[in-house]
Structure formats: C-alpha cells, structure tokens
Amino acid sequence: MFSSATTEEGGFEASSNSIIDNDYKSYGLELESSYDVSEDLNFRGGFTYTKAEITSGANDGNQPRRQPKLMYNFIPTYKFSQSKNTLGLSFIGQTKAYAQDNNDLVMNGFVIVNAFVEVGITKGLSVNVSGNNLFDTLAITESEEGNITDNAVNYVRARPMPGRSISMALSYKF
C-alpha cells in the first residue's frame, strides 16, 4: 500500500509552453505474486491500483495526466518435454488515462498480448521465437496536447507502444 501528497513548485513544460503548478495526493495498492501450479506450470502476475487527484489550481479534483487507475500483468508459462522447452504468454495492460491534467482528452486502456516458445535443440543450444503485441493493439502511453478544438486542424503528438513484431534467436550456453 502507498500514500503520497506532493507539492509541485512549478515546472516548465516545453511541449505546451506552460508552467505546471499542481499539488497532488494519491494512494493505492501494488501486489505481485507467483504460483507454481505444478513443476511445469507457473503463473506470475501483478497489478498496481492508484487513486490520484490534483488538489490545487485550475485542475483541482482532476486525475493527473498519464496516470491510469489500474496497471497489470499476467504471465503464464509451461515447461514441456522434461523441462527442456518453455511456452509462455504475457498480458500487459492498463485502464484509460488522461492526456493532460485538464482531463479533456482520454487515452484508451489497452492489453498487449505477447507469446514465446523456447526449444532446446542440444545441450546448451536453444532456439527462441517471440511474438510481441500479437494483435497489433494501438496502445498510447503518453500524449502532449489535451484539447481538440472544433472547426480547426488539431495535432496531437502521442507515444504508442511498438506494434506487432516477431523475432527468433539462437542461443548457446556454455
């Protein structure tokens, strides 16, 4: 569990050419766990729940920018053929968050699904195939502008998670 109250002295934000001068309070819970169902099957996961609020200024009562209420991960893995090989998935996600402290523009929540398989070829030699963001999910984690103006050209700079990728690696351990 955590709790915090922060007084921000005012920082310059170059992208919006403005001074950020907000006070904040937050509390929440973070939990991680791992469970071996059997010698071959394992579940790992974690989540962070955060209740955060701006407590001063023009945005008093709003949720701070880029702060989802819930972030989570879940990673099942399975070893097969005498534990020489491993198959796994990971689910990484978060709920919606706001682009700016005014809470006008929402960045949608998302779940990114990854998978991997590692196969032992010989003693010390293995091949790993990984797929990241298998469903090519658009996951925005950060954005600069917070308003969309009617009857105007609007530009919003955003930082997405990488799209789908597949990779293969050959490893030798000696």
Walk through the language-model features, giving the residues of each.
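Flexible, surface-exposed loop regions and adjacent strand-edge segments
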Residues: 2-17, 59-66, 93, 104-109, ...
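Feature marks flexible
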Residues: 3, 16-21, 160, 164
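Gram-negative outer-membrane beta-barrel transporters
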Residues: 13-101, 169-173
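Aromatic-acidic/polar surface patches that form glycan- and anion
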Residues: 22, 65, 106, 159-160
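Transmembrane beta-barrel architecture of outer membranes
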Residues: 26-28, 69-73, 110-114, 155, ...
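Short, basic/aromatic-rich helical patch in the C-terminal catalytic core of site-specific tyrosine
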Residues: 31, 115-118
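Active-site lining segments that contact anionic ligands and/or coordinate catalytic metals
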Residues: 84-86, 110-112, 124, 163
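C-terminal beta-signal and adjacent terminal beta-strands/loops
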Residues: 96-97, 119-174
